[in-house]
Amino acid sequence: HQPNQQVYARICKALGAEPPVNYVYELFLDQNGEKISKTKGNGISVEQWLSYAAPESLSLYNFQKPRTAKKLYFDVIPKAVDEYLTYVDSYHTQNVAEQIENPAWHIHAGNPPKDLTPISFALLTNLVSASNAETKELLWAFIGKYAPGTTPQTHPFLDKLTDYAIAYFNDFVKPTKQFRAATDEERAAFEDLIKRLDALPADITDGEAIQNEVYAVGKDHGFEPLRDWFKALYEVLFGVESGPRFGQFAAIFGVRETSALLKRGLAGELLKAA
């Protein structure tokens, strides 16, 4: 309709009416950058999206960059969820001018909620992977230790997020996981990390302190670039190439449990179970 905007405007003026304010937007593309069509069935329905994430995440996805042809496929869901959570959290620390520019202001009609969740969607999917959780009750056992006082009743959004994380993991992450064995260089670093984690208090929940230990191991063992060290952790332990901050995961999963997971990775147990 873009080429006809001027025609529409002239017709409105001829009839004595105010021309409409036009807004041009792009349609979605699939993961290969091709146009989505009903014939190909290469898109995502609203119902499918809402099986794995809250409606607000879809609102954010639609709100952002409407003039850009965005790729719409299942892999974008976790990012949309965590971006939504980031916007909601940041809203409450912003001044009025910044708040109005925040997508959360528009999604929630000027009144975004507070304290939705202390844990990101990406971390929850990793927690599902590491704990082999089939039900959200197991996830809540870890969450309760990490954030005492946090319950399904106090954080209903997080309760729904646990359901979404389990569903998304089972349908999209689990089928594509590719575990591998640690190399000799990585094995030495894993063993060092196990020792460092075992030296920390069992009830530590400071993700940054744990992250510093993980970072130090990578530096001490000469990983260059350092992201190769974190890539190795995720490939050996989770069967994926990347993920959220490892220290934060260990804080939620527990340092003793993370140490045990590292030992299983070294023993090849995760490779056998895949």
Roles of regions detected by a PLM:
Residues 5, 25-163, 238-273:
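Catalytic adenosine-cofactor/nucleotide-binding cores of aminoacyl-tRNA synthetases and other
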Residues 1-2:
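N-terminal catalytic cores of NTP/NDP-binding nucleotidyl/phosphoryl-transfer enzymes
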Residues 13, 51, 219:
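Short polybasic/polar patches that bind polyanions
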Residues 19-22, 235:
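Beta-sheet entry/capping signal
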Residues 13-20, 224-225:
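Secondary-structure transition/capping motifs at alpha-helix termini
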Residues 140-274:
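Basic, alpha-helical terminal appendages of large translation-related enzymes
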